[in-house]
Amino acid sequence: MVNINATPCGRRGRNTDVKLDTLEIGKDAVVASVASDDQALRQHILDMGLTPGTEVTMMKYAPMGDPLEIRLRGYELTLRKDDAARIELVGIHDTDTGPRANAAIGTTEHPALGEGTYSPRAAKTAMPEGAPLHFALAGNQNCGKTTLFNQLTGSNQHVGNFPGVTVDRKDGTIRNHPEASVTDLPGIYSLSPYTGEEVVSRQFILDERPDAIIDIIDATNIERNLYLTLQLMELDRPMVIALNMMDEVTANGGAVDVNLLESLLGVPVVPISAARNEGIGELVDHALHVARFRERPGRLDFCAPDGPDGGALHRCIHGIANLIEDHAVTAHIPVRFAATKLVEGDELVTEALHLDRNELDAIEHIITQMEGEAGTDRLSALADMRFSFIGDVCGRCVVKPHESREHVRSVKIDRILTGRYTAIPAFLVIMGLVFWLTFGVIGAALQGLMEDGIAAIIASADAGLKAFGTNDVVRSLAVDGVLTGVGSVLTFLPIIVVLFLFLSILEDSGYMARVAFVMDKVLRRFGLSGRSFVPMLVGFGCTVPAIMSTRTLPSEHDRKMTVMLTPFMSCSAKLPVYGLLCGAFFPQATVPAMVSLYLIGIAVGCIAALVLNRTAFKGDPVPFIMELPNYRLPSVKTTVMLAWDKAKDFITKAFTIIFAATVVIWFLQTFDIRFNVVADQSQSLLAGLGSIIAPVLAPLGFGDWRASTALVTGLIAKESVISTLTVLLGATSPAALSTMFSPFTAYVFLVFTLLYPPCVASIGAVKSELGARYAVAVFAFQVTVAWIVAFVVHSAGILLGLA
């Protein structure tokens, strides 16, 4: 076990030996020591700012008593009681609510390009005018990074208010600068490889070697954001800092001396507001300049030779740097960065340097000597070095309001949405309202209009083709195949767009993060953490991005479990199937029938989680450490653009995948093996293929070859189930559907549709995230579970006399 017992600065009171998990709500205290059996977890806690000497405020405990929420360094952090119990506190006192005395900082105009006071280290030769430039856009989670990327490139990437929206790198070209491209990297808190995002971001900068880094900082919380900035500076790449959300800082009465800040850091700092598109032009000018002239940060050293530790860490880092310089140059790793990572015990950097045993022993001796002289362990020493430097910089450059309007508003909202007795009811009301508006009010009304419009188009096309004297086979292909098949799917476009609109609003507002906080204890019983709740909630919209978003989960156990369970959450592509069959067979109870399917999916997911957690994924519970962002009003532009993107994707799918599937299905059901037009569909090619699978589904009550064929095409895209049934039956009226299903077997069919794999794209997402073997395992697991559950429902129905 790694443990520290450092004397914190600024002790107050006489309380000692108090653990963070027992701190009363509304009380402040100072961190005395941090312990953990997991070295990587402990480093992550330190990187988040929970270092010895840090003052913390207990904000609340989750409605079920765990996890807890604390405030430190200007932001909210959640962690579980088990982890909080390893953090010792001293100096417990009541929260200081009085006005904070800050030295005033006058308003100074930010210097234009070339007029700054920072001192970069420029290369001897500049890159030629018009040479290709590539930028890496890096920053903390939830700091406006993707919003800035959209402003720089004109793209419409999804912008949310939940940590970890960007789960993969996104590339784009800077507007009006065709020679300049930018990559939006996943949001991270440090360059320590705690999560997959941090590994992706770090390896991109080290391996791809972008011409410059654009580091975006949340100006409302500079102290926490600068922690990553210092590590990026150690990479010794040309760099510019985008100080985002400056409009919020000034609106709350705060100020930042930008000129002094960039002078102290040795890096150009440009104040911007990405949401309002302010300062973007100046940022681009500075970024192009530092990249073209290869201006690297003016300083790389943040530990003073005469610091509180007597210069022990300074001597340690410089000693290691001298020892490994040749190895670092050969491995193309910046020397200063490599030295600090060796102090941390970073295995990836250690392997890349190819150090021999004698060199490793020498480095360990240097680090051990530093720990003895500094009176603390290596991880705490590095974190304290960075935060001490940051504290000095912020003390000279930043005036913070005692409490921002955004935080005051968030605290008031959280009294209801995360309150002990109101959180769960509020969640149920919100989700119930979302589904009611989607399926019963707005979506249903718009769907009716869409159905009328498409029916009119099909009727007009049929009449026109008849009047033109078109061949009956060709007319059948156009009307019965393409128009009817694709049109039946397009009628569900309004419902899907409305659902995505509501999910976007919940995520953009910051509520998703609160749901993870509230639900963590529940999910822990199933072997998951609260962070897994968000990917599964996204899965109600689309399984593919939900699976991709599991990359934000720090634990491989958590990630694999979530990937395995997310497809059981009913995605929006299944809505057309539910809507058609529930509307046909349960016209008086369409919404309850559809909601019951969602509940079955959740229940099956919970049962599967319990089984997997006790078998294939047996192990200790994963940590839950997450930032809680302030609530923000959802951006109308962002919400509308997301809805438009989803509508565009759906329409594209309808006119590509579903169009092709419809044509293939029409062809197979129109011709026999000799390519003669069949009078009886049971003699068609499609009937022969469907009959191969039908016996497997017969015990479930729908052994009809048409049902099995629809399920097979549904693997391409779930909407294809509807287009296939439409083509095979010639219509989707209750009368037509009743020739194949009874109300009971229709419901069993829906249960199977709910639980078997959503689509080929979702399996492809599993393959890209976890590999081919795991993708095959997920596919087999879902098909097996779907068959078993459908069989149980069918058997129970027979026993109850429902069949």
What are these regions (language model features)?
Residues 177, 202-269, 577-578, 582:
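Conserved C-terminal guanine-recognition region of P-loop GTPase G domains, centered on the G4
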